Amino acid sequence: MVLLLGLIVIGGVTFFISNAPSEEQQQKSEEMAMQKTPGYETMTAVAQIANTHLLENAILNIQVTPKDDYEVVLLQLQTTEFLTEDILLKNTYNLLQDIRKIETIDTFTVAWFALINSENTEVLTLTFNRQALEQAAKISYNELPSIVTDYRKHESLN
């Protein structure tokens, strides 16, 4: 009787272990679930654009907030050295040429950070609505402040 019970338990454990998903299958399932997450496609597209136009490790954070049929995106970037407002505007302009092609983005904010007195500080932030994103293709980089819905500049950029 005990022997029979032991065989049943061992058989059940063996069956359970053999039917458990492998680590690879588990990872694939998780990746597929992430791809179905609202905003995931936009987040990966924004990351690819930023990595194409900027130095490696420039991305601090990307937040995509789905709102009905559109998305609100926040891209936080790190400068490797303290740059001028002019250079940050040029870099932002270059990003916008591809960002504007992502039609689901309704509001796009780019925030630049730099080390000031050993502290990571937000030095320039620009927020664009959909209309401003479209306009960015028709103006020069130094006109970006005139089309944004929000423009914040740290005093160190003066």
Q: Where do the PLM segments sit?
A:
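Surface-exposed flexible segments
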Residues: 26-35, 90-93, 117-130
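Short, non-transmembrane amphipathic alpha-helical segments
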Residues: 85-106
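Stable alpha-helical elements in mature extracytoplasmic
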Residues: 42, 46, 88-92, 140
